[in-house]
UniProtKB/Swiss-Prot annotation:
Activity regulation description: Inhibited by vanadate analogs.
Species: Arabidopsis thaliana
Motif Nuclear localization signal boundaries: 81-86
The protein, known as: Tyrosyl-DNA phosphodiesterase 1
Keywords: DNA damage, DNA repair, Exonuclease, Hydrolase, Nuclease, Nucleus
Signal peptide: none
Mutant phenotype after disruption: Developmental defects, including loss of apical dominance, early flowering and dwarf phenotype, when homozygous. Hypersensitivity to camptothecin and failure of DNA damage repair resulting in progressive cell death. No visible phenotype when heterozygous.
Effect of H236A: Total loss of activity
Subcellular location: Nucleus
Region (Interaction with DNA): 379-382
Gene of this entry: TDP1
Top-level taxon: Eukaryota
Distribution of this protein across tissues and organs: Ubiquitous, with a low level in roots.
GO cellular component, one term: nucleus
Length: 605
């Protein structure tokens, strides 16, 4: 990691105005290698190690050409253009312009000193926050992880996970719940699946794809598509349930079981291992997480199957089977949606009404009164102002210690612009996974909500979001945070009907809600796969001790993350978000775009 940022390169357009669609390149004290990985447009004339800029804290800098093509330096003093040939080295000054290829790829060099350097180092700390996101084992179940992105450097994937980090160890039965399933990719990306005796895939694929999967799947795999009683619904939930001899692993995430979702996009994943309940002890008191989980699994109604579990014999795997595990260490709640017309007791079990009900029971710090809300997702339904107010009322629920309601806060929608998609790692192709039509995106009342997908601190500015998150925050502190499969739509969250006595939901969805929760133990870890499955350090308590509650913060929060109550969440986007400028255009996938992307393509292809 760089010790001190002392300069940066500003990307410029051909007219020498700043190119806001590309990130600035920070330069630290000492040598800095710049090459094709720093440029958003593919150009084979650029070498991976094209130039080296050596910068000192005194404000001096030199540039040497390491690639096979010359570089042009345009002096900030007299405007003279000087060609620097391969293997040559020259001095460069503040505000000099650098052309990585003569006439192409313009950058302005800015050298820092004093106060500017201190401010820049703070910005650098923010930019590299993902580098430092290394939560200890005991905090992992209380946070989530981002998925690794192939095109990013190793440091940008710190503490990130891939499918083989999730499906591991001596799994005896697996349930994979998802919308889209590429069976060929899944088997090649995760060879471990071939050795699991019983695998069920709960999916949302259409008839044609379902027939293909049926032909390609291993003989011991079972396919199940849950019933969709209301038109235009989908099975959209993304979860994995792995049964081990020691317990069960529950995983909630945002990626389809396809290559691009696990390799090219910004995605999130939460998981926790839970032990079997001890038959020789009184059963643990039921907890909210267990109720959330069993309620949801009961609705899926998959065909019961049998698995042989070491020491337990043949066991029927159905929804009731999952009551055999001890979920008392869960610090999160599950927010699910299931299709139907929900009334009475069921009105508050699903969708945004479930979220409303849980938040109403929570006590939050006073700083979150009327604090802002974020809606971030990858597909926008056909909305109206009435429903958005209904949804906002649910997300504004909660009280402070003196019973004062948190009250409504300003809401913003984080949504990629056309330029974000064009300059992304996938170019316009990324827009296939942001499938919202013009008629939904360009409703006039939505204009005031739009905010930019800015993700420098997680290095995911060009990894287009398929992650879905909803949160309430104050600066870098978070009241609550939801990682979910739900996009912003009535189909996913439900719409109240019949004078608010009925909630109509079309789709299956699943999310995990992070809340401030009591810190019961320190160093409490259970693992289904580690050689030492359980490590427990009892918390020292005194009679007068006030029960501490966890505090949720972002990766860029500047406090002490080692405090036991601090739970750092890898929120991938900038908070507060930057509202759209007049020039920003929200992405819609059924519009034509003639400006070529980073691969020289237009849209549609």
């Amino acid at each position: 990691m760089a010790h001190s940022q002392v300069a940066y390169l500003i990307p410029l357009k051909a007219d020498l105005k700043e190119d806001n669609s590309s990130p600035r390149i920070t330069l630290s004290e000492g040598p800095n290698i710049i090459g094709r990985g720093n440029v958003s447009i593919v150009d084979k004339r650029l070498s991976r190690k094209h130039i080296t800029i050596i910068v000192s804290t005194s404000g001096s800098a030199s540039l040497s050409v390491d690639g096979t093509n010359p570089v042009v330096i345009r002096s900030s003093g007299d405007g003279e253009r000087k060609k620097v040939k391969p293997s040559e080295e020259v001095s460069v000054c503040n505000d000099d312009l650098i052309e990585l290829i003569p006439g192409h790829h313009f950058f302005k060099l800015v050298l820092l000193n004093g106060r500017a350097a201190k401010k820049a180092r703070k910005a650098e700390d923010d930019v590299e926050a993902i580098r430092r996101f290394c939560p200890p084992n005991e905090k992992l179940p209380s946070t989530f992880r981002l998925l690794s992105v192939d095109a990013l450097p190793d440091w940008a994937n710190t503490s990130c996970v891939s499918i083989n980090d999730v499906i591991e160890g001596d799994v005896v039965a697996a349930i994979l719940s998802n919308y889209m399933v590429d069976i060929d990719w899944l088997m090649s990306a995760c060879p471990k699946l071939a050795n699991i005796p019983q695998v069920m895939v709960i999916h949302g694929e259409g008839d044609g794809r379902q027939e293909y999967i049926q032909r390609k799947k291993p003989a011991n795999w079972i396919l199940h598509k849950p019933r969709l009683p209301i038109s235009f619904g989908t099975h959209h939930s993304k979860a994995i349930f792995l049964v081990y001899p020691r317990g069960v692993r529950v995983v909630v995430h945002t990626a389809n079981l396809i290559h691009v979702d696990w390799n090219n996009k910004s995605q999130g994943l939460w998981m926790q291992d839970f032990p079997w309940k001890d038959d020789d002890k009184d059963p643990p008191k039921g907890c909210g997480f267990e109720g959330d989980l069993i309620d949801y699994l009961n609705v899926l109604k998959w065909p019961e199957f049998t698995a042989n579990l070491p020491g337990r014999g043949n066991v029927k795997i159905n929804a009731a089977f999952f009551k055999k595990f001890d979920y008392s260490d869960a610090t999160v709640r599950l927010i699910a949606s299931v299709p139907g017309y929900h009334t009475g007791f069921n009105l508050n079990k699903w969708g945004h009404m479930k979220l409303r009900t849980i938040l109403q029971e929570c006590i939050f710090d006073r700083e979150f009164r009327r604090s802002p809300l974020i809606y971030q997702f990858s597909s926008l339904g056909s909305l109206d102002e009435k429903w958005l107010a209904e949804f906002g009322n649910s997300l504004s629920s909660g009280i402070t210690e003196d019973k004062t309601p948190l009250g409504p806060g300003d809401s913003l929608i984080i949504w990629p612009t056309v330029e974000d998609v064009r300059c992304s790692l996938e170019g316009y192709a990324a827009g296939n996974a942001i499938p919202s039509p013009l008629k939904n995106v360009e409703k006039p009342f939505l204009k005031k909500y739009w905010a930019r997908w800015k993700a420098d601190h997680s290095a995911r500015g060009r990894a287009m979001p398929h992650i879905k998150t909803f949160t309430r925050y104050n600066d870098q502190k978070i009241a609550w945070f939801l990682l979910t499969s739900s996009n912003l739509s009535k189909a996913a969250w439900g719409a109240l009907q019949k004078n608010n006595s009925q909630l109509m939901i079309r789709s299956y969805e699943l999310g995990v809600l992070f809340l401030p929760s009591p810190i019961k133990t320190q160093g409490c870890v259970f693992s289904c796969t580690e050689s030492n499955p359980s490590v427990m350090k009892a918390k020292q308590e005194t009679k007068d001790e006030v029960e501490k509650r966890s505090k949720l913060v972002t990766m860029t929060w500047q406090g002490d993350r080692d405090l036991p109550e601090i739970i750092s969440l890898p929120v991938p986007y900038q908070l507060p978000p930057k509202p759209y400028s007049p020039e920003d255009v929200p992405w819609s996938w059924d519009r034509g775009y003639s400006k070529k992307d980073v691969y020289g393509q237009v849209w549609p292809r």
